[in-house]
Amino acid sequence: MTEAEAAQELARLAGLLAQANLAYHTLDAPEISDADYDALKQRNAEIEARFPHLKRPDSPSEQVGARPGEGFSKVSHAVRMMSLGNAFDDADVADFDRSIRKYLGLDVETALAYTAEPKIDGLSLSLRYEQGVLVQAATRGDGEVGENVTANARTIADIPARIEGAPEVLEVRGEVYMSHADFAALNTRQEAEGGKLFANPRNAAAGSLRQLDAAITRARPLRFFAYSWGELSEPLAETQMQAIERLAGLGFQTNPLTRRCADLDAMIAHYRDIEAQRATLGYDIDGVVYKLDDLGLQARLGFRSTTPRWAIAHKFPAELAWTRLEAIDIQVGRTGALSPVARLTPVTVGGVVVSNATLHNEDYIAGRDSRGQEIRDGKDIRVGDWVQVYRAGDVIPKIADVDLNKRPEGANPFEFPEQCPECGSPAIREEGDAVRRCTGGVICPAQAVEKLKHFVSRAAFDIEGLGAKQVEQFHADGWIREPADIFELRSRYGEGLQQLKNREGWGEKSATNLFQAIDDKRRIPLARLIFALGIRHVGEVGAKDLSLHYRDWDAMAAALDTARLAALAHRAADTAEEQERQQAQAEGRRARISDTRAAVIAAQEVPPEAAAAWADLIGVDGIGATLGLSLSDAFANGDERAAFDRLSAHLTVIPPDAPARDSPVAGKTVVFTGSLEKMTRAEAKARAEALGAKVAGSVSKKTDLLVAGPGAGSKLKTAESLGIETLDEDGWLKLIEGL
């Protein structure tokens, strides 16, 4: 490898690893496997060792985690939260022991004890206690600055709010995780409610901890293992093992498989023991962490730039198996997304029989990622291929590699369908979207079933006795084709009660109860109705924002009708803008974006009332153009609009409570920042809105009041610089007291 090639490869690796860190640590959506990540990092280290003068300022070897997200206030760690070096085999562990002895000047005969503990696959968390009281919880972030998740951490049963007999200042560090059983139960609940399924327990734990609404975190079964510490006002113990035992004595959960190992042989033996138990532990681990037991020697060894010299993670080999890809099936979801699924010759991976694997989208099958870069060295996936399957607690396992040497003669590249396999409608892929979608809408049976499941989910109509299973049965029998049919069941089949009660699994009481439950939902809040429609991009929060803005179903529908021409002009401008950007890039000039948009919109001759209605729609806090276009398309689609109208004829839609107009915050823009100890962020937002305030997510000249809790960061500084009134939580509660 030449210097030029090395520099080019280091730049490529820096970009790949930065994206991987962002996806894993900040977005909670890993894009590559742990094994692939470790391989990239190892290659980067090897090239840097050969060409040290080419080491980049943004070298992955100097990075820990990724920058914190934008949804929480930031916390600076008093003691940096470090990463760990990796060992991939016994020889690496022996090298680790040898390097410690060399650094300390100890020969091979000198006894060195280590602790060995499972490496939990979760999210790192630092808990700060002062005078025995939990005052702050923060994620690792980039090691120096993390996210303040104190309110969420307080909801985790394994995390004590108070501890007795601890140092005045104690930062306890550990891992938030989710057990396999709890993960399966959560996904079952998510599916029944029409919610998003989590890919694996680690993603579920990370996503649950990083909720802006602590009430959501409280409803998720999170656990916590303590294994380390940060800032201390006095030492915990003299050895690592004693310190772990003291943490357990203070009331923290510590891993029962943590052992003190007298020598290298004992470390490897315990690694083998943990590896053998891995499939039966009930939670995910991806290796064993060794730490020098003597804390005095740990202090002498100190740290490298991102890792301690006295600890290392001995990683498990990836759980992999080879099998044959028998078929590729296409499933159609609620929003029309065509999702390919691999049907495999059953194979055991990590103690579990696997017969299906996700293939994500057509790019993944073709050997490309979402940015068009090669994955699997550009190897595509074909029916008949021998594929390498891996799993790490995933709902559906994934394909890691393809053996081209075993590819059957005549195996053809997979042709992703351009028509929906369920209804035959065109399946199109919009610019910038990784997914191809069916355009059939309500005429597509697959979309209809998934939309109906969403409609009856807990966050939508929540009809007792009518869940996903019943929806599938009723749809298959032709009883329910669209939401309006649910409210016609009694009239259509109810002298038909006899028909329903005679079905398998039904009786007179359950049938009567179902009809009553349906009748109970004929009065529905506007926000729930909007969410229940299953319009793409419209979640619970967006539905609530729309309901607060329009306050009436007919008023919202009329506003969308008025705004339609402006919405179409906006889409045409988006298309022209992208074409101009591509053409400018090809011609090596600067794109004239604003001129292009203005010209296209002017050419559409949008009526003023349409422009005003569109501006009003996308100006709703939290809505924007993407959601606005999706909403406009749904109401402009003849079949969908007719279905909406048939449904609304059966309902009495309840407007949201009118916000108070005589409160001290009515008409004001309020921002909350930092930790709130007496209410969740969602409760604070709901209360402020009920009192007539508008709650914003950022501070600007339009902000009237900032409510700042502990850990308030840049928002507080901005408010002070702008002269904006600031209150602490108690001041806010006093302001609204009695209202």
Swiss-Prot record:
MF-aspect GO terms: DNA ligase (NAD+) activity; metal ion binding
Binding site for NAD(+): 34-38, 83-84, 117, 140, 175, 291, 315
Protein residues bound to Zn(2+): 420, 423, 438, 444
Source organism superkingdom: Bacteria
Domain BRCT: 660-739
Keywords: DNA damage, DNA repair, DNA replication, Ligase, Magnesium, Manganese, Metal-binding, NAD, Zinc
Signal peptide start-end: none
PROSITE patterns given in the database record: BRCT (PS50172), DNA_LIGASE_N1 (PS01055), DNA_LIGASE_N2 (PS01056)
EC numbers for this chain: 6.5.1.2
GO cellular component: cytosol
Catalytic residues of the enzyme: 119 (n6-amp-lysine intermediate)
Cofactors: Mg(2+); Mn(2+)
Ranges for region Disordered: 49-70
GO BP terms, alphabetized: DNA repair; DNA replication
EC class (word): ligase
Gene3D superfamilies: 5' to 3' exonuclease, C-terminal subdomain, 6.20.10.30, BRCT domain, DNA ligase/mRNA capping enzyme, Helix hairpin bin, Nucleic acid-binding proteins
Family affiliation: Belongs to the NAD-dependent DNA ligase family. LigA subfamily.
Function: DNA ligase that catalyzes the formation of phosphodiester linkages between 5'-phosphoryl and 3'-hydroxyl groups in double-stranded DNA using NAD as a coenzyme and as the energy source for the reaction. It is essential for DNA replication and repair of damaged DNA.
Annotated NCBIfam families: dnlj, PRK07956.1
Name of the protein in its database record: DNA ligase
Organism: Ruegeria pomeroyi (strain ATCC 700808 / DSM 15171 / DSS-3) (Silicibacter pomeroyi)
